[in-house]
Structures are given as structure tokens and as C-alpha cells.
């Protein structure tokens, strides 16, 4: 019976303490802050707020418990620390040119009864240095293995390293991490190995460092590599379709690293070699049918040799007229057209003269010594148009 009688008493005590408990959970005099992250060399703002200051001032102190500001009054002589805002409900300060040593817990206090505090954890990011690539000493031969090392110091937290060749990602080994002597930052390193090909000649191998302090900015170093490889060659004719009587150049286009320094021309079935020179062209000043055949060009460097072949077929002389023949044809066409026009004019002129021959002779007769007789002839001729069948005599 004793236990049930004690239950109402416990409930009564709980109800009597409830308001006090609610006040403690909603303490208007409790200040609040927030954690901050800043890059080394940057500026951080510490903000402390309180709802009920109880006629007391707010105070900021550093991890060493040195007072920085008490209200609007500076307490520590450090020009990097400046007052941003000071009101009964807020105290904000800024720290510029932040160093790694500034990292830690900063305390905001209000001197009420009891004293209330709030913590702000300041994290300082160490910026990684530009990476350094080592391991490349001299040019590599095709199919040899290249091994490069990359290293970057000063990052906090430790950075990550990545490799690429042009736009192609290279898979290096896992990033190695080593703590720097200051005990705060880290040195990271990575290596990459790959077999080189002739396509890698002149390629840039890039090592990049990735870190949150860079905020997406690129921080990388590149190493250009040189690859030595055997030459290749191809023969290009100029003109592309040679004909008998033309001038022909056969260009032997050699490629390689190093570039071929010697070219030897041969024709199948003929001895000795046609030409041995440092220049790559074989010249035919005047092509003949006998020049047809298969020609070989051997390009040589200190990495080796390569022979390219070309079959030459000399075609018959071009039926296409030369420029001078074309010019003469144009002149001949113009002359023929002019002659044709003159003939047309002569035909029309002859036809005109035939139709007007009588009139021409009559006028000519008027100018002679027998002009009276001529007039008589003209009159008689005119009268003859109405005289029927009478016989008329004319004097011309």
C-alpha cells in the first residue's frame, strides 16, 4: 500500500519542477556561435550572439584563453584582429591573414550568474604548393618505360595528386602522405609508369594537385617528353599524273625522330643506285617512256631505315592543247567571225546593186553628151506604160 501512495507525490514534484526545466532548456542568456573554415592567408569572421544579455558584455578569447575583445574594447594588441560589430546582443570580430597557428577553439563568454560560454572551432586550410615532377632525364626510345615522380608540400589536410597525358588520364600509384616538420601540413607524392610510343613524342605529362583550399583552381606542372623512333617514308609525285615530255619530281617524305638525314633512290632492275643525297627529291627533267618502272626510296636516320616504293607509269603526251595553242585558236576564231560578217555584208550589197541596176544606168546617161536623147528615151519609156502595144524606140 505504501508504493501506490507515493506515486501522486512524485507526479506533484515533477509538475512543480517542469517550469524550471523549461527555462533551462530555453536559456535566453546562452550565447551561440558557429564553426568556421578559412584558407591560410584569408580572413575569418567570428560572430557571437545572445538574446538576453542581462546587462553584461560579450567577450571573445583565443585558444590560448587570451582575451581578444571585451565588448568594443580591444584587449590584445594584434592589428590582424578588428572589431566588426559590438551591440548588447552581438559581438563580431575579424582575423585577417590567418595563419595555421590561428587554428583552434575560440570562446565567446558572457559574464552572467553563472558565466555562460560558446565555442567556435576555426579550421585553417593549408594551401598545397605547385607540384614538382622529377624522374625524366633524357629522350626515350620507342617501347621503353617512362617513370615520373610528382610531389607537393604544404597542404592541410593532405592533398591528392592525379596524372594525365594530354587529355588522357594516367593511373599512377596511390598518393603517399608524409607530415611536414611543422606538424600541421603534409607533403604528398605519387609516381606513374607507362610504355612510350611514337605518338607520345612531344606529349605533355601533367601532374595536378586537388585540394579544397584551391576552390576548383588548377594547380599543376607538366613535363614534355621526347621519344626516338625509326623513320617512315612515302613517295609523292609532282605532277600526280605525269606524261611523256613533262618534268617530274618524286618527293620522298621521311618522318621520324630524329628526322631522316639520308635518302637513297633505286630503280628495280638497274644498278647502281640512282641517287644518294641529303635531299629527298628525285628529278626527271624530261620524262621518257623508258623512265616507267618501280622506284624505291630508303630514308635513313641513326634509329634505322625505311624503304618506300612507287610505280611510275609514263603516259602519252597530253592531248590537251597548250596555252599558246589555245591563244592561237581564240585569235583564229575571231578572224573567222570577222570574215563571216564581211561575206554577209558583200552578199547584201550585191543583192542591193542588182535590184537597182536600171536606175543607176539611167542617172549615168544623164551626165553624158547625148543627154537630150537620153531625156527623150526616158519620156518615151514613161509613155510606154500607157501606150498599149505600140512599138517604141529608145535611145540610150
UniProtKB/Swiss-Prot annotation:
Domain annotation Ig-like V-type: ranges: 23-124
Listed GO CC annotations: cell-cell junction; parallel fiber to Purkinje cell synapse; presynaptic membrane
Organism of this sequence: Mus musculus
Modified residues (Phosphoserine): 386
Cytoplasmic side: 350-396
Region (Disordered): 365-396
Tissue-specificity statement: Mainly expressed in brain, in neuronal cell bodies of cerebellum, cortex, hippocampus, hypothalamus and spinal cord. In spinal cord predominantly expressed in motor neurons. Expressed in axons, presynaptic nerve terminals, glia cell processes.
CDD domains according to UniProt: IgV_1_Necl-1
Signal peptide: 1-22
Subunit structure: Homodimer. Can form trans-heterodimers with NECTIN3. Interacts with EPB41L1, DLG3, PALS2 and CASK.
Glycan attachment residues as annotated in the record: 288
Extracellular side stretches: 23-328
Family matches, as InterPro entries: CD80_C2-set (IPR013162), Ig-like_dom (IPR007110), Ig-like_dom_sf (IPR036179), Ig-like_fold (IPR013783), Ig_sub (IPR003599), Ig_sub2 (IPR003598), Ig_V-set (IPR013106), Neurexin-like (IPR003585)
Main subcellular location: membrane
Gene Ontology biological-process entries: heterophilic cell-cell adhesion via plasma membrane cell adhesion molecules; homophilic cell adhesion via plasma membrane adhesion molecules; protein localization
PROSITE patterns in the cross-refs: IG_LIKE
This protein's name: Cell adhesion molecule 3
Alphabetical UniProt keywords: Calcium, Cell adhesion, Cell junction, Cell membrane, Disulfide bond, Glycoprotein, Immunoglobulin domain, Membrane, Phosphoprotein, Repeat, Signal, Transmembrane, Transmembrane helix
Amino acid at each position: 500500500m505504501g508504493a501506490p501512495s507515493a506515486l501522486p507525490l512524485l507526479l506533484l514534484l515533477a509538475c512543480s519542477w517542469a517550469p524550471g526545466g523549461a527555462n533551462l532548456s530555453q536559456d535566453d542568456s546562452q550565447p551561440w556561435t558557429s564553426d568556421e573554415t578559412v584558407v591560410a592567408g584569408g580572413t575569418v569572421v567570428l560572430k557571437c550572439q545572445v538574446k538576453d544579455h542581462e546587462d553584461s558584455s560579450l567577450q571573445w578569447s583565443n585558444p590560448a584563453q587570451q582575451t581578444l575583445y571585451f565588448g568594443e574594447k580591444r584587449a590584445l594588441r594584434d592589428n590582424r584582429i578588428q572589431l566588426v560589430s559590438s551591440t548588447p546582443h552581438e559581438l563580431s570580430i575579424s582575423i585577417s591573414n590567418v595563419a595555421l597557428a590561428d587554428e583552434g577553439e575560440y570562446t565567446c563568454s558572457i559574464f552572467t550568474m553563472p558565466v555562460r560560454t560558446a565555442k567556435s572551432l576555426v579550421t585553417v586550410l593549408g594551401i598545397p604548393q605547385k607540384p614538382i615532377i622529377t624522374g625524366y632525364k633524357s629522350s626515350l626510345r620507342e617501347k621503353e618505360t617512362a617513370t615520373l615522380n610528382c610531389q607537393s608540400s604544404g597542404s592541410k589536410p593532405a592533398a591528392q595528386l592525379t596524372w594525365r597525358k594530354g587529355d588522357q588520364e594516367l593511373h599512377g600509384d596511390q598518393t603517399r602522405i608524409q607530415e611536414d616538420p611543422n606538424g600541421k601540413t603534409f607533403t604528398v607524392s605519387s609516381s606513374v609508369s607507362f610504355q612510350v610510343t611514337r605518338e607520345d613524342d612531344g606529349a605533355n605529362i601533367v601532374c595536378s594537385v586537388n585540394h579544397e583550399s584551391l576552390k576548383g583552381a588548377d594547380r599543376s606542372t607538366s613535363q614534355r617528353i621526347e621519344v626516338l623512333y625509326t623513320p617512315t617514308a612515302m613517295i609523292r609525285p609532282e605532277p600526280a599524273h605525269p606524261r611523256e615530255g613533262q618534268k617530274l619530281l618524286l618527293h620522298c617524305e621521311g618522318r621520324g625522330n630524329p628526322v631522316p638525314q639520308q635518302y637513297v633512290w633505286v630503280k628495280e632492275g638497274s644498278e647502281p643506285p640512282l641517287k644518294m643525297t641529303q635531299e629527298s627529291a628525285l628529278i626527271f627533267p624530261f620524262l621518257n617512256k623508258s623512265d616507267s618502272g618501280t622506284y624505291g626510296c630508303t630514308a635513313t636516320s641513326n634509329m634505322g631505315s625505311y624503304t618506300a616504293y612507287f610505280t611510275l607509269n609514263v603516259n602519252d603526251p597530253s592531248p590537251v592543247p597548250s596555252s599558246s595553242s589555245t591563244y592561237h585558236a581564240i585569235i583564229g576564231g575571231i578572224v573567222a567571225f570577222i570574215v563571216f560578217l564581211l561575206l554577209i555584208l558583200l552578199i547584201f550589197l550585191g543583192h542591193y546593186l542588182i535590184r537597182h541596176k536600171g536606175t543607176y544606168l539611167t542617172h549615168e546617161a544623164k551626165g553624158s553628151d547625148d543627154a537630150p536623147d537620153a531625156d527623150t528615151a526616158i519620156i518615151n519609156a514613161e509613155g510606154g506604160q500607157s501606150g498599149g502595144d505600140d512599138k517604141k524606140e529608145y535611145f540610150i
